Amino acid sequence: MAGMAPEGSQFDAKHYDSKMQELLNQGETEEFFTSYDEVHESFDDMGLQENLLRGIYAYGFEKPSAIQQRGIVPFCKGLDVIQQAQSGTGKTATFCSGILQQLDYAVVECQALVLAPTRELAQQIEKVMRALGDYLGVKVHACVGGTSVREDQRILASGVHVVVGTPGRVFDMLRRQSLRPDYIKMFVLDEADEMLSRGFKDQIYDIFQLLPSKIQVGVFSATMPPEALEITRKFMNKPVRILVKRDELTLEGIKQFYVNVEKEEWKLDTLCDLYETLAITQSVIFVNTRRKVDWLTDKMRGRDHTVSATHGDMDQNTRDIIMREFRSGSSRVLITTDLLARGIDVQQVSLVINYDLPTQPENYLHRIGRSGRFGRKGVAINFVTRDDERMLFDIQRFYNVVIEELPANVADLL
């Protein structure tokens, strides 16, 4: 089914590779990037403060993941870093540790600013930062849209060490001078591929203009399109590069399958047939539009299947409640869109269903990286209509993976 490139395939892997090569081969590139290959196989070998180590171990980390083994120390040294690793490999804890190691806790001023593309992801980073910094007494605040501006201003006025937020609200706080940039010495872009997409690029530039000229910059991402690398040149000073080649973006530990559903209308019955299997574990179902989230939720509930749903049109409070229920396990099947893929950090998720295939190969990683987090096993099931065959081919070529047809014994895989 996916053995040959359909004509007119939207994604051209050769073009991607040649653009990346062209960028990395430019005359000044060698001066711009330096590679960083030092590996620290234990958190104890990284020279971290005792109370930060306590927080790391209390959070449940035992051994650093590959990106943490290479990424924490250069950030702690104050170097500008570009780091690429798939979702679920511990990127967030990498930059949180680097920030927490360098803060001056006696100075209750904002010293680190972290930007994220969605409210959910910003709030997730805030939680990780607070947990890892529990024994250090770190003060963190998430500035995101859909919450009270006055409350943000009150908390910022009382003093924080770290602000995490979405670009719109952070820029608003800087513009109102509620967030003072004078002490900011670290600036992190998380999920930079999304952040630097056209929607956020201008806001990030505006924010960067307001920050002190001497600042450490960290760029973290699961995928690193050439455009993102190009933009980092404007922000960064001789960064070290910890970059996974595209063919090394393995989705290790995640078994991937497709179900040939032929037509769009047949997807619902296929999902209902799978529902008993889904409810064994925690599952996330991705569709491509907010309207479809509502439609599928209604259809599933109409057939007496318990599901919860979240998308960007819901108010923040409702989304928070739904995510809390899902994290606690009281709701087990969540229907959502790409927009929120990056804010779902639920350790128990072991099944992701792409009811709709993503419209871009890059988003596939963000979606299915929700399962099999930190080495746990995960399963991804892709519903594929005739119209989707081209995208399935593109995804396999982009990640250098083979996606097999779903076997009958799917329950045994979970």
From Swiss-Prot:
The keyword ATP-binding applies. Residues 253-414 form the Helicase C-terminal domain. One of its GO terms (biological process) is cytoplasmic translational initiation. SMART domains: DEXDc (SM00487), HELICc (SM00490). ATP binds at A85, Q86, S87, G88, T89, G90, K91, T92. Residues 72-242 form the Helicase ATP-binding domain. One of its GO terms (cellular component) is cytoplasmic stress granule. Keywords: ATP-binding, Helicase, Hydrolase, Initiation factor, Nucleotide-binding, Protein biosynthesis, RNA-binding. A motif (DEAD box) lies at residues 190-193. Pfam families: DEAD, Helicase_C. Disulfide bonds: none annotated. GO terms for molecular function: ATP binding; ATP hydrolysis activity; RNA binding; RNA helicase activity; translation initiation factor activity. It comes from the Eukaryota. Belongs to the DEAD box helicase family. eIF4A subfamily. This is Eukaryotic initiation factor 4A-1. It comes from Oryza sativa subsp. japonica (Rice).
